[in-house]
Amino acid sequence: MANNNSFSMSTMFNTIQEILNEEPLTVPSPPSRGGYSLFHIRKAEMDIQRIFNFMTGSEDLKDDISVLDTGTLMWMASLMTSDCDYFMVITTNKNGSKTLQKLMGMSDDMDVFFFEAIMRLFIHVMTDKYASYVTIQGMRVFQQDKRELMYDQILRYACFLAGDQYGCIALNEIITDLDDPYYRDQLLDIVANNALLLSNDAYGNFVVQHVLKLRDSRCTRNIADKLCGYCVELSFKKYGSYIVERLLEAGDVPMATVVLDLLACKTEMLIRLARSEYGNFVVCKALELTNEILTADLFYGLVNRLMPYRHLLHRSPRSKIATILDSMSVPN
């Protein structure tokens, strides 16, 4: 935040993490108060320091919150949210984040301050290791009208958050907690519609995996539809193979989508996949899960493609595929 006063405490707070590639935040001096005396400015600076020390201090101090009166709590909430930099310095501190979460939900009047600060800095707090939990807590304890406005922001920035190191973790927490049917379906649809992009992303793939674990049949089918034709490519990758395995475990249409992708690729590619570090798990799981009467056509389709190259698969020590093929008597 731009500030006319020169007061700086950067030496005390030089451990604060960078936020979205900005310089590390420091506790700035209070905004200019026009005709206020130097005494008033210095007092405001001391108040900020006291708030910071309390909020980021030892865990042993957190019990002190319960003995604070309403007026003091309101003063604290107002002061720590009066400037974006003040707020971020506290929320990006591990203890500061935990203490702030304890203050949230104590009164609607206090929550107004916290809500407005979060909304002003939404992307910043959602992509920080500790500050993101402040937003998550707000979505748990704020009144419905405030939560809905926060949900709207989540929908707007879902893909961006999914591709961020800490944003993806926060997004997964929110997906787990979200109990509003409308917003839940909207968020799952965003993940499903962007499944290919997210599955190939270093962090986004964790969101796709998380959503598949929820076993929401509609969303799982939508993800399978978006990944149709790309399952082989994903199976060569560590985290991509996890997503493909989740689709196989879902059974029905998602499983058929994966196996048909395997059968559609060239034989050379299929054998290379079956011998690869991650792909062999996908092929093995496809064989294990389709070896039932209802999916026998898929199973024998794979077996017939792989059987002539069984000798090559024996050379892959990690693979159980050759063992499965050896145990089979494929009908003519």
From Swiss-Prot:
One GO location term (cellular component): cytoplasm
Pfam families on file: PUF (PF00806)
GO molecular function: RNA binding
InterPro entries: ARM-like (IPR011989), ARM-type_fold (IPR016024), PUM-HD (IPR033133), Pumilio_RNA-bd_rpt (IPR001313)
Per-repeat ranges for Pumilio: 82-117, 118-152, 153-188, 189-225, 226-264, 265-300
Domain of life where this protein originates: Eukaryota
UniProt domain PUM-HD: residue ranges: 1-329
Repeat keyword on record: yes
Domain characteristics, as noted in the entry: The pumilio repeats mediate the association with RNA by packing together to form a right-handed superhelix that approximates a half donut. The number as well as the specific sequence of the repeats determine the specificity for target mRNAs.
Protein function: Sequence-specific RNA-binding protein that regulates translation and mRNA stability by binding the 3'-UTR of target mRNAs.
Gene that this sequence comes from: APUM16
Name under which the protein is recorded: Putative pumilio homolog 16
PROSITE patterns: PUM, PUM_HD
Annotated localization: Cytoplasm
Keyword annotations: Cytoplasm, Repeat, RNA-binding, Translation regulation
Gene Ontology biological process terms, A to Z: regulation of translation
Keyword Membrane: no
